[in-house]
A protein has these predicted regions:
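A residue-level marker of the well-folded mature domains of exported/periplasmic proteins
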Residues: 19-368
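C-terminal segment of classical bacterial N-terminal signal peptides
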Residues: 2, 7-17
Length: 368
């Protein structure tokens, strides 16, 4: 059900795609510098490819997923594993993502010019190579996190909600690592919150990785104990700790990258909604284009609300948890972002905020 919902949300074409001329199926490798089961980012990528295989059939498309692990001890095998798949020579495309794979992919793209790659969720530096064999897709997470920030700021002072203390205006943000993509989430979150409450305060913490849920829980518990009643986790598996902390504290936590309320039903009451980055759908789109010979290698594409690259889960659960007046305001903001009336500043791209501007924005909402 999740895979189908993801496919529908991006408007992915269901026009039949033909197998290759040699009769062999199109073959992809998905290399994860992490593991499945994160209920988030990597599960989204795997769900997208699984949905594509179910749609087209294994005689047309097949894929293998390699879980390389995310710990410090695992990092040493990421590049050798990538090279092993390149040496194999049987994959039409090798897929990997995140800033942690950038150096390895840059090396591989230069050493294997005939191997095609799809790189997601971090900007590829084409001045270092890859103009002919790397396709790059990123997401406008600042747009969807703007809505999350606005919703958090509206909910934190809503006296109709039992899990908030309306006497203060403190919300939380838990990041995995302090990189450009996580900063893009953060600056969108702050801008959205300030748009509805200029006096909002944001408790900010970084786990230092994307896998340590125990550390994530400890940090989130501290935020909740210090007055935050709504948090936003952008930390992969480590972010699951924030959701656990929200349950233990009787507070809220927004999900990320997948519909975490649906994936974690025991915790759903504490998860108003999730900010989804449609990784799986972007991979479906890219592979279908590649099968038709139309994927623009050497190009970076950004996907936001207008392109179907991000979304906010708005289902029956969302309608049950979030008051109608808040939902109405969020709908209006989303429409304004989509049509360009609201321009959300970003930590990424040609028009990115400077580091000084980002820090000034963070300082403007610092707790205490």
């Amino acid at each position: 059900a999740l895979s189908m919902a993801m496919a529908l949300s991006l408007g992915v074409s269901t026009v039949p795609v033909m197998a290759e001329d040699d009769g062999e199926p199109y073959k992809a490798a998905l290399l994860l510098n992490g593991t499945l089961g994160d209920k988030s980012f990597y599960d989204s990528a795997n769900a997208g490819l699984t949905a594509l295989q179910e749609e087209l059939g294994e005689d047309v498309f097949t894929f293998k997923v390699e879980q390389m692990g995310a710990t410090a001890a695992d990092e040493a095998k990421w590049e050798p594993t990538l090279y092993d798949y390149c040496d194999d020579g049987s994959y039409d495309v090798i897929i990997c993502g995140t800033f942690q794979m950038l150096a390895a992919l840059t090396n591989a793209a230069n050493d294997y010019p005939d191997q095609k790659f799809i790189y997601f969720d971090e900007m590829f530096d084409y001045t270092a190579g890859g103009e002919e064999n790397v396709y790059n897709v990123m997401y406008k997470q600042n747009e969807v996190s703007y809505l999350v920030g606005a919703m958090a700021a509206l909910m934190t002072t809503d006296d109709s909600l039992e899990m908030v203390d309306p006497s203060n205006s403190i919300i939380g943000f838990l990041g995995g690592m302090e990189n450009s993509v996580i900063k893009d989430f953060l600056v969108g979150y702050i801008q959205g919150a300030q748009a509805v409450n200029p006096d909002i305060q944001v408790a900010l913490a970084y786990v230092g990785n994307f896998y340590d849920s125990a550390a994530g829980k400890d940090m989130a518990l501290t935020q909740y104990q210090n007055g935050a009643d709504i948090g936003f986790n952008v930390a992969g598996s480590a972010g699951l700790g924030q959701i656990e902390a929200a349950v233990d504290s009787g507070r809220y936590a927004f999900g990320v990258d997948s519909d975490q309320a649906a994936l974690l039903p025991d915790y759903a009451a504490n998860i108003p909604t999730s900010a989804i980055k449609n990784v799986g759908n972007s991979l479906i789109r890219a592979i279908k284009l590649d099968m038709e010979g139309e994927l623009p290698y050497g190009t970076l594409e950004y996907m936001g609300f207008a392109e179907g690259g991000v979304e906010l889960v708005k289902d029956a659960h969302y309608e049950e948890v979030v008051p109608e007046d808040i939902r109405t305001q969020i709908d209006e903001m989303q429409e304004q972002i989509t049509n360009g009336e609201i321009e959300v500043q970003s930590a990424l791209g040609e028009n990115a905020m400077s580091e000084d501007e980002i820090q000034a924005l963070i300082d403007s909402v610092q707790v205490g």
